[in-house]
């Protein structure tokens, strides 16, 4: 079965300090190309026979692994964005400032890093070490060791084999150059302002219970519904009160939009 392009797990227009244009380009071009290339590689693998040179099979399997990592990490990255509009005094996250780690997560990671501030310093420092290069920074939960680690994943493939990524930051230049140029530090700061901490906590819970990481289904975002033109017309015709806060054209043939 071919790998499908997942609906983008964040509404790009709701992010703070990250342009919709950059997120859409990242989703369509980088994530989308990874999915399409993965499917092409798997078609080649399905066609191998006894006459296939071993080096070719080895190369295809290495490429498949890298692409699988790229697809999964991109989906996790988009899935842990979108928190800026979610929090507030009644969010239950206990966060007084967007740049601070919520109390619920601070309690989770304090044992392994000493404090939330110490974790953040290491995570941010690791991300800054990749500026001008490429790779991912991951907060992972080791199911075997029952603890958290910050890790670098280069070429989409390098991470502890027992680790579940619970927070993912893309440090490839395509993730930030359009908006931030070479200023990776500003991008990292803005990333923290947009983390969906609720998604992170759900991933931690799943990892602790040896459950699959949850899919960030954008349809669960009920506070900002999307309607087609036909659905909107029907609601108006039925006399329903409708407030339009955002309207934009999409090309259905290019991608799946919410």
Give the positions of each predicted feature:
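Feature for soluble, non-membrane regions of globular proteins
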Residues: 1-218
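Flexible, polar/low-complexity N-terminal or interdomain linker segments that lie immediately upstream
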Residues: 208-258
